[in-house]
Amino acid sequence: MKRGKVMKKKSRFLTGLLSAALALSLCAMPAMAADNGETITSTINTAQKGSLTINKYEGDKQDPEKLLDGVTFTAYKVADIVQSTEAGTTDVKMQPVEALTKIKSDIQITSETKYDDIKDTVDAALAEDANPKLTAFATATTGDNGITGQAVFSEMPVGVYLIVETGAPSQIVNKTANFLVSIPMAKEDGTGWNYDIVANPKNAAVYGGISLKKYGKNYNPDGTFSEVALSGATFYLQRKEGDDWVTVTAPTVSDSNGSVDASGLLTTSANGMINITDLAPGTYRFIEYSAPQGYIMDGQAAYEFTINNDQTVTISDAYKDTLANTIKVVNEKPSMEKQVKTGVDAYGKATDASVGDVVTWKVTAAVPSNVNKLAKYILTDTMSSALTWESETEANLTIETNPNVKLDKDTDYTLTVPEDGTEGGTWTIEFTTAGKEKLAANNVTSISVTFNTRLNKNATVNKEGNLNDASLTYSNGFKSNDEEYPTQPDPKDEVIKNEASVYTFGMNIEKVDGKDSRGKLQGAEFDLYLYNGSETNPTEAELKNNGVKVGHYTTDVYGEIHVSGLKNGTYYLVETKAPTYNVVENGETKTYSYNLLKEPVKVVVNVQYEVDTKTTITTDANGNVTTNKIESKKYVGGENDSGNYKVIIKNNKGFNLPTTGGFGTLLFSGIGVLLVVAGVGVLLSLKKKNRT
């Protein structure tokens, strides 16, 4: 009977303790005993140490893909398990620790106790002024043991422990509720004890997203611009952790909106987007690493934003896009154009001129708003040998800005020019630090430089014309010296080259015998005039008054004159001396002159030309070079569309007659016919009178 009573008491104890252990473990989150095959006994081995393994999941499911590192738990021992045996009966009690009984002497922890029942007492025992204070047994952080999402407390003496989640990543907005766990716990079948406990608490996690859209601000030379979505720009994403910024090496990026490499470098997609999801609440920033060719990379800007606990995003108005939750980042791309004066107030890509004419050129360049941060902003002009730099005075190089700002030579810029009288040569305008600051401070959007050259004898006649090219050299970015920024590449040079052209044309004059064109007439002399008047058949006097004498020329042994360096216009050749020829009469050689042309010979030079610009981009060790080279689109005029006009002039012997086939010949023949008719009429009239 006695033995039976003892067994009944033990059984009641086992059932009660099992219930207590399960109740304690179920106060907040489930815990279970790990079946490690230990020998089952009906009493607790109070000298044995146990362990608590916590597997931490995000959300409310035990999803292996959602194991969470970085969660810290703290264990506080709140009760000892005390065993006593009397008369063969084992009695087990949960005895609260002194830190709790000092606060509340009658505190009890039983199988029915929940954490909320002892919360106030625990809070008081954790206060700084508590004496004694409830101290932590140990802390453990998931992932620290090398297993994702797992934290382990080991060497835990037998007792009841309060488990508190004391640290978690920012996406965890609702921490695991505090829970109690006993070491050991009864096995589920009630047959014994397990000292190695497993708990699987869960959290409510919150994530947010952010988008970045990259725009290219493409400047026209006059400072106007358009914005386009810009692909191929790269960024790093950093997260603020305490006082430090740490690069996010594996952000989650939408496949269609950006890409990321193994280092965490993000690249904008074809639509200029980077779309990042699954960001835990916290403060972040984008740092630009590189910009596409031609664009200026702003490596000093930090595009900061905050993912809030309610999943909203806070973005500074300074770079907030019109798209929701989107940061707007703009890269600027300057441009430059070379032009030549084509009219009173007109400029274009090509004009025509005569040798000796003044040709005025214009270089126009866009000024980026961040020009003051660039190491270089330089304008250069290179003239062909067909262009003479007469002097700085004659060149009258003038710099204008929009809006108008006075720039001081040697303070705001330096100017180097060719020596006076140089055929060809280069001038350079390099803006100083002070000059770049002045441009930025005054919001200057464009610069134009005009200057004069003179077309010289080196001018050639061809469909490419005589080129003059300009270039703009600027730095393609500026980086930060902040040590917490990702290491950025050093800026390189971007060079834009642009051409304009001046055309000139020619005449090939051939003097031949009026009856035999094989006879080439040497020694004929002509004056060539460019006529600007309104007379249909101007006389030599009219040409002298309202024309410009181009030159005086004499036919060579082949009867030819070659004239080049002519612009489009109406020209007249005035013969001032006719060629001569020899005749042997009665054994004696006599010299006679051909007839001198009675009126000027008209020659219209009208070459129609158009040019296109072909752009090529090359890259070298110093940076990128964009060349905008002129290509002929249309070039029509002259013999075989060469720009050279062929003029054949015939001279007759014997009388001072006009050129064969010319209007003068027709007039002379007409007068002769009229005289013959008149003579016949007179004879008929006389005969009639005689009859009467």
Per-segment meaning from a language model:
Residues 2-692:
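Solvent-exposed loop/turn and edge beta-strand elements of beta-rich ligand-binding domains
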